[in-house]
Amino acid sequence: VVTDFTQKELPTNTPRKDVFAFIEKELKEIIPLLPSGITYGRFTQNVANTLLARLYLNAEVFTGTARWQDCLDACNKVQGYSLTANYKASFAIQNEKSPEIIFAIPYDHKQGTVGNYLASMTYHYNQKLAFDPAGVYQWCGNGICAQPGLYSSFDAKDVRRQSLLIGQQYSAKDGSEVLMDDGSPLNYTEEIDNFTDAAKNAGARLNKYEWSANDSW
């Protein structure tokens, strides 16, 4: 933990008990300074108390002393939320009115984030052809994928399984198979054949967030 920005020496590792105390102190100090209520995309007292609750939840691991009552007290200060009936509603583009989002980071071109950067990083370059008849999508990076086995760890009826994209992709224009640049089908596999030189379609992709063809640089 470094609090003096004029310090020139390399910092040493701080014991986890001290890190815990530092985070607790910081959160408790800022809570009175933060706005109350629910504000989309802004850090509020609810957000800080949620983080404080998570900190206390793991207090015994970090410090050796359980803080269950403090965790409960922090949870009881987080008010005004409820679960949505539709699991995917909180991950939709227009989710500002979601009753369960405590803290959101807006990802769209209006906020200067070029849409959902994380989701774009995971799609194959030609995934745009499955999204839009004209192939309009801000960009696809084919950069990251899920660990093997994650997709199958969810029961087939578990809605959370839909958060991962797997299998053959089809054109939004005519229903034909989307192909990769080498002419082979864009068929996402759960397994990864070679971690140092993986096939471009290896690994399940992130499919949790609603995509938009209208976001742009």
Describe the predicted segments one by one.
Residues 1-44, 56-63, 215:
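Aromatic-anchored glycine-rich loop motif in surface-exposed flexible loops
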Residues 3-5, 76-79:
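Short edge-strand/loop segments of extracellular domains
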Residues 16, 41, 45-46, 71, ...:
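Active-site-proximal structural scaffolding
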Residues 30, 71, 77-82:
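Alpha-helical solenoid scaffolds that mediate protein-protein interactions
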Residues 49-52:
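TPR/Sel1-like alpha-solenoid repeat signature
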Residues 63-64, 113:
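Short, solvent-exposed loop/turn segments that connect beta-strands within catalytic domains
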Residues 80, 84-217:
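Elongated scaffold/linker segments in the mid-to-C-terminal portions of large proteins
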